[in-house]
Structure formats: structure tokens, C-alpha cells
UniProtKB/Swiss-Prot annotation:
Residues 123-191 form the COMM domain. Signal peptide: none annotated. This is COMM domain-containing protein 2. PANTHER family: COMM DOMAIN CONTAINING PROTEIN 2, COMM DOMAIN-CONTAINING PROTEIN 2. Component of the commander complex consisting of the CCC subcomplex and the retriever subcomplex. Component of the CCC subcomplex. It comes from the Eukaryota. It comes from Dictyostelium discoideum.
Amino acid sequence: MIIELDNTHKQDLSSLRSLSAEIISEFCKIALEFIKKGSNKKLYMGASQKLNIAADKIESLVDSITYLFSECTRFMLNENDFNDTLAPIKLSDEVIEILRESYFDNRKDIRNTLQEFYPHLDHYQNLEWRLDTQIANRSLGSSINPIYLLKLITKCGSDNPIEHLLQTDPNNLKHLCNELESALNEIRTYENRLIIRNIK
């Protein structure tokens, strides 16, 4: 899989051609700090004075490197895909090597940092059910609909399981089962399996 970079990111990354290996490594470190701790204007100002480059240009370049690293980490790109992503920019082998090394050395940390921003949703653990129906009633001549009582148990991370008590009638339960079956069939398609494989 290849990450499609927009024109702004391509322009910023192409400006790495004119910089030395030491400065590119420094930009990679600043980008990694940006991912972990957020933006630091003082760093940009210091780098601006040291390199004689406008602070907003430095910030834009760091943003582009940050985007490259975070997107590559999100899709867990391998070495070939990483190289193919940068191929349209026509960077030298040395520049690509510095970026690649910085990315692969820190990929696990970047992934852990990015996961903190994702919502922590409950996951299914167990489901128990019981069918309740009234056998007889003198006041009602018509038949009585049975009721399903469901106990859904979910868990979020290492927290204790949470019990959810639900009640439904057979028609709604059948509709729910049909919708879940449809969702399971949808997730088995080639496109969705490809997306899921890249998310993991």
C-alpha cells in the first residue's frame, strides 16, 4: 500500500534535498517530539535562527514529516511501501534512508501515541438470554407476545466487565439478527478485509 501525499506535503518534503543529513535527522527528531508532545514554537524559532529559514517554513516541513510518519504507522507500511510512497518526490537515497530509519526505529512509539487519541470502545465478552411469556390471562382474549431478556456483557481494556440488561420482542430481535448478519457478510468482502488488515 502507498500513502498518497498531497502537493503541500510533497513540496515540503522535496525541500529536504537541499539540507544536510544532520539537519534532516534533527527535523525527524522534532517531528517525533511533535507527535508525542505537540507543537513547540520555541523549537521552531531556535531552528529558524540556526538554519536561517523562516519559522513558518520549518513548521510546515515538520508537519509534513509528522504526517508521513503517522500515516505510515497507521497503515503499518513495510520498507518497500515506504520507499514507494516517497518515490514521486525523487529524494536522494541518503534522505530516504534517514527518513526510513527514523520511521522504523520509532514506529512502535508512534503507534502507541496515536492509539491514545482513538476512542476506547467496549468490546463484546458474553451474551445470555431468557425467553419470558405470560401463559394465561383472563382479561385478554388475544395471544400475548413473548419477550426476550438479554444480558450483554462488555469489557473495555483491563476494566471490570459491564452488564447491560436489554428487553426486546421477537420481531425486533429477528431484525437485529438480520442486520448483524448483513454486517458480517459486508465485512467479509475483499475491500473490507484489505482495510482491516491495514488498520491492525
